[in-house]
C-alpha cells in the first residue's frame, strides 16, 4: 500500500481518534489518506493551539494526543505546545511533513532541520527514510510517549517517502507494566516513618497518572500522615478530607509550606522536581526524604532520598500501608492548625462586593458553580497562582494547570481537548487577558465543533503575573500594560456568546447560565490584582513558631529557655529588604540583632574592624558576628537577596525589655558570656 496509507493505518491500530492540526502542502498525502480513515482530523487555526489540544487530550485520557503541522513554519508553530506537553508529562505525538529527500541536502524552500529542532523538547524525534520502517517507528513513538515519565515524541514524514509503496503491515500495540516495588526498600521506608516526629506526604502529578489516589488516601488514613499536593497534583486527596493540607508552591512562607518546613520526613509520591523545586522546601537537605515514583529520583543537591522506591506507585503505596499496619504515626492536632488556617482563608471575601472582583471571590463562585467532576483549566498568569492556592478539588484531573513549562495560551485550546475527552463534563477555562489573546483564534475551532464550554477572562489590561513578580522584587513595575479589544463583541464575531461582569454579585448568575448553555460562552470579568501584593506581604509574615525555631538554631540564643525565647521573639520586628538597601547603616549600635529567615546577608566591618566580609546563611545572627570586630558599632550588614525576610531586634528596645524581665536578662547574659568565652578562646 501507499506509505501515507500505511502511516494512517498504523495510527488507527494505536487507537487514535483525533488528529489536531493545520494541513500543508508537504503533508498532503497524509491528508488524502485520512479521507478513508476512522480518525477525525480537527482543523485548527494555529499549530500551537493544535498542540495544546493534543496536550490536554493526552493528559486526561492517558492516550497520546496527536497533532500535525507541515514543514518549516508549521513545525516551528508546534514547538511551544509540544514542549508544554513534554514538561507536564502528557503523552503526545507531533507529526510534521518535510520536503522531498532529494532537496534536503541543499538550500530549499521552507526546508530546515526539523528533527534537530525538536530534539531538546521531546523524548524522541526521527524522520522516516524508508516506507517499510513506518510500523516500527509509529509503534516505538507511541510506546515512548506513554511509558513513564510520559511526554512528547516527534515524527517527520518527507513528501516523497509518503508516496512510496510498502507491503509491511501495522504492528499490534503491546502494553507494558511498571515493576513491583522492592520489599527491602518498603521496609526501610516504614522504619523511617515509624521513627518520625512529624512526617508529611507531598503528592505530585505522578499519583494522578498512576490512578493511585485511593491507595494514597488509604495510607494517609491508616497512618494519620497529612497530604499536601503540588499544583498538578490537585485532587490526589479530596480537599474535604481532614488529612488534606491543600496545595503547596506559591511562596516559601505559605501556610502549607510551613507545614512541610515543620516536617522531619517528607514522603514524596509521584513528585516531580520540574514543578516545585526541592530547594524551596529542603534547602541544605535538613529533612529525610522517601521517594515513591515511577522512575528513580532525579539527582539534585536538595533532593537525595534516604529511600528511593521506583516502580508501580499503586503497588508501593499498598505495600507501605501493609508494612506499617494500622499504626497512627501523626496526631491530627499536629497539623490541624495549618488546615484550619487555610480553610479560614478560603472563607474570606466569598461575599465581597468590591469591584473589580477580588480573585478569592471569583474562585469561590467558580467552585460553587462547578460540580466535583467538572473540569477547570488554568492558563498561565497571576490567576494561575490564585487557582493553585484557592481552588480546591475533590477528585483527580478536575483542575489542569500548566506548571512544568508554564506556557501562556494553554487554557483555551486545552478546553477543546478536555471537552473532546469528556463530552459529558462541563468545562471552564480561566485565562488572563494576556494568555487569552495568545490563542484566541481557536475560539473559532470550539464554535465550529459545537463544543459547549466557558472561557472566563480575568481582565486587568496588564501582564498581571509579571507585575506581581516585578513589584515583589523591585517595588515597582515596568512595561506591562496593553489595551484589550471589546471581548463581548470579539466573542460574538466568532459566533460565541459574550458576557461582561459589571458587579461582583452578578458573577454567580452569569457563571451558572453560561455553564448550562449549549454554546461557547466568553465572560469578561475585571479582576482586582491589588490583592496580589497583599497576599505576598501576608505570606511573608513570619509566624511565632518559625521565629522560635530560628532563635533556637542561633548560637547566640541556644542557651535560652522556651519562655525566654518567646519574650525575645515578641520584641522582634519583621522587615523585608531589597539587595540595594542597608539593613544596618554605619554607626548604628551593633547590639541590634538580625536573624535572616530567607536569603543571605553579608557583613562588612568598618575600616578599623577585623572583619572584611562574612556571609550569613538563613538563621545566622549578625550580633554574634559583630562581636568579632574591634569596632562593632561601625559594622554594616547588607542583604544579599531581593526580598530577604528578616527578623530585627533593636538593641535599645531589647535592653528595655530585659530590664523589665531581669530573669530573662540574666539568662541571656550568661549565654552571651559563655559565647564570648568560646570566641576568645
Predicted feature residues:
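A general structural motif
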Residues: 46, 106-107, 176-190, 248-252, ...
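Glycine/charged-rich beta-loop-alpha catalytic/anionic-binding loops adjacent to active sites
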Residues: 35-41, 60-66, 390-404, 472-474, ...
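Regulatory nucleotide-sensing modules
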Residues: 548, 552-612, 616
Amino acid at each position: 500500500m501507499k506509505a501515507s496509507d500505511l502511516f494512517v493505518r498504523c495510527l488507527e491500530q494505536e487507537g487514535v481518534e483525533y488528529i489536531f492540526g493545520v494541513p500543508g502542502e508537504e503533508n498532503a498525502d497524509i491528508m488524502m489518506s485520512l479521507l478513508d480513515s476512522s480518525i477525525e482530523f480537527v482543523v485548527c487555526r494555529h499549530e500551537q493551539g493544535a498542540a495544546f489540544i493534543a496536550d490536554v487530550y493526552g493528559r486526561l485520557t492517558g492516550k497520546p494526543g496527536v497533532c500535525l503541522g507541515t514543514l518549516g513554519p508549521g513545525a516551528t508553530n508546534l514547538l511551544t505546545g509540544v514542549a508544554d506537553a513534554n514538561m507536564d508529562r502528557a503523552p503526545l505525538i507531533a507529526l510534521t511533513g518535510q520536503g522531498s529527500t532529494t532537496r534536503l541536502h541543499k538550500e530549499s524552500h521552507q526546508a530546515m532541520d526539523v528533527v534537530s529542532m525538536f530534539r531538546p523538547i521531546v523524548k524522541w524525534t526521527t524522520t522516516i527514510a524508508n516506507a517499510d520502517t513506518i510500523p516500527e517507528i509509529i509503534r516505538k513513538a507511541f510506546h515512548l510517549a506513554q511509558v513513564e515519565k510520559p511526554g512528547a515524541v516527534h515524527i517527520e514524514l518527507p513528501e516523497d517517502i509518503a508516496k512510496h509503496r510498502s507491503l509491511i503491515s501495522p504492528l499490534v500495540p503491546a502494553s507494558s507494566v511498571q515493576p513491583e516495588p522492592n520489599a527491602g526498600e518498603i521496609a526501610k521506608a516504614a522504619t523511617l516513618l515509624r521513627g518520625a516526629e512529624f512526617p508529611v506526604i507531598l503528592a505530585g502529578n505522578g499519583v494522578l497518572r498512576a490512578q493511585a489516589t485511593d491507595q494514597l488516601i488509604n495510607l494517609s488514613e491508616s497512618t494519620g500522615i497529612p497530604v499536601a499536593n503540588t499544583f498538578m497534583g490537585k485532587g490526589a486527596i479530596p480537599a474535604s478530607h481532614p488529612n488534606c493540607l491543600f496545595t503547596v508552591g506559591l511562596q516559601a512562607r505559605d501556610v502549607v509550606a510551613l507545614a512541610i518546613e515543620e516536617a522531619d520526613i517528607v514522603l514524596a509520591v509521584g513528585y516531580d522536581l520540574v514543578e516545585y523545586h526541592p530547594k524551596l522546601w529542603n534547602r541544605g537537605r535538613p529533612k529525610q526524604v522517601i521517594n515513591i515514583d515511577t522512575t528513580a529520583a532525579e539527582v539534585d543537591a536538595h533532593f537525595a532520598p534516604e529511600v528511593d522506591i521506583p516502580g508501580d506507585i499503586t503497588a508501593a503505596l499498598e505495600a507501605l500501608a501493609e508494612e506499617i499496619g494500622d499504626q497512627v504515626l501523626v496526631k491530627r492536632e499536629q497539623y490541624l492548625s495549618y488546615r484550619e488556617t487555610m480553610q479560614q482563608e478560603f472563607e474570606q471575601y466569598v461575599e465581597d462586593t468590591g469591584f473589580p472582583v477580588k480573585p478569592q471571590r471569583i474562585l469561590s463562585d467558580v467552585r460553587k458553580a462547578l460540580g466535583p467532576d467538572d473540569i477547570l483549566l488554568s492558563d498561565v498568569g497571576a490567576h494561575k497562582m490564585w487557582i493553585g492556592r484557592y481552588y480546591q478539588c475533590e477528585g483527580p484531573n478536575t483542575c489542569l494547570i500548566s506548571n512544568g513549562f508554564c506556557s501562556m495560551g494553554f487554557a483555551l485550546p486545552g478546553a477543546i481537548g478536555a471537552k473532546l475527552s469528556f463530552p459529558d463534563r462541563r468545562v471552564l477555562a480561566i485565562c488572563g487577558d494576556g494568555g487569552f489573546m495568545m490563542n484566541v483564534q481557536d475560539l473559532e475551532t470550539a464554535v465550529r465543533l459545537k463544543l459547549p464550554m466557558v472561557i472566563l477572562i480575568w481582565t486587568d489590561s496588564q501582564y498581571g503575573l509579571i507585575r506581581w513578580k516585578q513589584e515583589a522584587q523591585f517595588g515597582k513595575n515596568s512595561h506591562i500594560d496593553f489595551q484589550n479589544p471589546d471581548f463581548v463583541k470579539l466573542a460574538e464575531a466568532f459566533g460565541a456568546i459574550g458576557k461582561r461582569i459589571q458587579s461582583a454579585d452578578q458573577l454567580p448568575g452569569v457563571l451558572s447560565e453560561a455553564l448550562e448553555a449549549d454554546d461557547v460562552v466568553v465572560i469578561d470579568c475585571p479582576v482586582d490584582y491589588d490583592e496580589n501584593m497583599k497576599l505576598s506581604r501576608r505570606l511573608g509574615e513570619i509566624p511565632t513558631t518559625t521565629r522560635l525555631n530560628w532563635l533556637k538554631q542561633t548560637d547566640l540564643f541556644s542557651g535560652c529557655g522556651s519562655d525566654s525565647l518567646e519574650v525575645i521573639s515578641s520584641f522582634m520586628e519583621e522587615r523585608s529588604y531589597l539587595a540595594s538597601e542597608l539593613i544596618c547603616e554605619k554607626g548604628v549600635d551593633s547590639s541590634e540583632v538580625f536573624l535572616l529567615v530567607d536569603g543571605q546577608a553579608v557583613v562588612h566591618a568598618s575600616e578599623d574592624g577585623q572583619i572584611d566580609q562574612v556571609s550569613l546563611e538563613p538563621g545566622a545572627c549578625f550580633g554574634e558576628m559583630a562581636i568579632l570586630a574591634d569596632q562593632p558599632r561601625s559594622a554594616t550588614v547588607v542583604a544579599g537577596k531581593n526580598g530577604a525576610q528578616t527578623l530585627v531586634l533593636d538593641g535599645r528596645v531589647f535592653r528595655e525589655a530585659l530590664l523589665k524581665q531581669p530573669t530573662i536578662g540574666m539568662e541571656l547574659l550568661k549565654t552571651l558570656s559563655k559565647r564570648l568565652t568560646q570566641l576568645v578562646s
